[in-house]
Amino acid sequence: MNQCLSYILLTMVLAGATSKECHAQGAPSDREVDRSIVRALKYLASQQQRSGAWQLQNASRGQDAASTTSLAVMAFMAAGHVPGEGPYGEAMERGIRWVLDNQRPEDGLFIHRAGSGPMYTHGICTLMLAEVAGMVDPSLSDRVRKSLERAILLILQAQAVPKGDRHAGGWRYHPSSNDSDLSVTGWQLLALRAAKNIGCDVPAEAIEYAVSYVNKCSDRNGGFSYHPNHGVSPTRSGTGILCLEICGEHRAPTTMAAADYLLRRPLRYDDGFFFYGVYYCTVGMFQVGGRHWDQTRNHVTSLLLSRQHPDGSWNPSDGSEASFGPNYATSMSVLALAVEYQYLPIYQR
């Protein structure tokens, strides 16, 4: 009897370990994903400049070092590291200070060098500050909060610029833009939601207005497009899903139609803006949960781990993100792979 009971208990333990370790036959185990993240963070730490920044390979595509630095800081946070503590704490703190130093005094815009799309950079930097605000040393906390308040005000002012009905509620490349797209809107909405979550003054009406724009970009057959009625894609569908999920539209019909679309047409490595897409699709489908997350998790981890370089990096060597370089791609990959840790507040279900 005792031998039988011992066998049953051992079988249950092994079954539980197998279930935790292997999400699907052929998909990377949790340990393999963990090791991949560790290698990626070591790579990122080796690439930080003396100034505290992480540079883009080429700043001509509308992003700059401020956005890449913010993504790198969030990548460390997503893996459980805290500014000012542990092996990467000092590097993270230097990165945060560098971003703060690159906020324009006249209007609060984050920008390191001129580019065609400064609102991309601004949204990413604002999101990062909202995520670290409660984790930084008290000596830095007040500065982060004041910077965040100015950054949020600029986002709200940019949303309020008069736009036609098709574009109302969203954002585009510049604070003064009178049109919108889902890509820029996604970063601003994530930033506002994260800031509101920590008690910043973000009117509910601004969130609702932005959600109304996101819904305009949805397709009745499932998925989201760059502009309303522009043609759906996996990358934009991930953006739409995440935006709606974090704004209270959990598993809403529009969200689920897009999630079903992503199961039918999952993200591919040769898709335009793959690393942008892998972040949004992964985090968005994690929020949806259930079979949608299970299938996405297995697909994305297999895809990313097979493309990781021996030094721990990912490098968009060709295509739409080729000029962004490995710091950007590696940060986005870690943000996708680390979603199940739920260390970043925006990741929490």
Model-derived regions, located:
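N-terminal secretory signal peptides that target proteins for export/translocation
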Residues: 1-3
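Sec/Tat signal peptide C-region and signal peptidase I cleavage site
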Residues: 18-24
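Bacterial N-terminal signal peptides
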Residues: 6-17
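An alpha-helical repeat/solenoid feature that recognizes helix-turn-helix modules
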Residues: 25-42, 50-91, 104-208, 216-260, ...
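TPR/TPR-like (Sel1-like) alpha-helical repeat modules
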Residues: 304-305
